[in-house]
Amino acid sequence: MLKTLPFFLKALKDLLLRNMNIPIPFSHLQITGTEFNYFFICHRKLWLFAHDIQMEQESDNVYLGNLIHEHSYPREKKEIMIDGVIRIDFLDDGAVHEVKKSDKMEESHIWQVLYYIYCLRQKGVDIRNGVINYPKQKRTTDVELTPEKETEIINTLIKIREVEAAPHPPAVLGSKICKKCGYEDFCYS
């Protein structure tokens, strides 16, 4: 698949440069919500994940997040799969809901929910709003997909594929968030 990426990236860029309002078919993207989220956290993490180096399953933080997800909002239908790529935690009152452990990475959470809304809209679902649920903190954040954010999502999709197509992983971030990352041992050993 990586061999066809330069053509795909060029086609996406051409569409943007011509400022055409043509939706990108979701089925051609095959970018997961996790990839979209990782782009806003760490490009190295995104690259490693895209190259099947997945260390998060051993992370205590991921385990705790999964427990919170499983036991919060028990009345809601959980994990709605779209094309085997996108997993939405639940839909309620016409809004996409995403359950997160904490708001420490809220920007990435916001963009992940916006991406889910974008994907649903590409499939013909009339939805513009989302909610990020932080049950441990007993709070929510409302999210709305605007035309400007939709354009940013398209730009981000291009950038994600560029990061993933690179021959080598990006440099180590060297940030305080690295200490809680499932990839910390890989990056710093």
Protein language model annotation of sequence segments:
Residues 31-38, 108, 169-176:
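Structural motif
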Residues 1-81:
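Charged, glycine-rich intrinsically disordered N-terminal tails and low-complexity linkers that flank
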Residues 70-83, 122-189:
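Metal-dependent nuclease catalytic regions and adjoining charged, substrate-binding loops involved
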Residues 109-121:
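Short, charged, amphipathic alpha-helix that recurs within catalytic cores of restriction-modification
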Residues 21-29, 92-100, 159-168:
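Short amphipathic alpha-helical segments and their helix-coil junctions
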Residues 42, 88-103, 116-118:
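Conserved catalytic cores of phosphodiester-cleaving nucleases, focusing on short active-site segments
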Residues 58-93, 104-111, 138-145:
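Active-site metal-binding core of divalent-cation-utilizing nuclease and nuclease-like domains
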Residues 33, 110, 146-150:
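Generic detection of long, well-ordered alpha-helical segments
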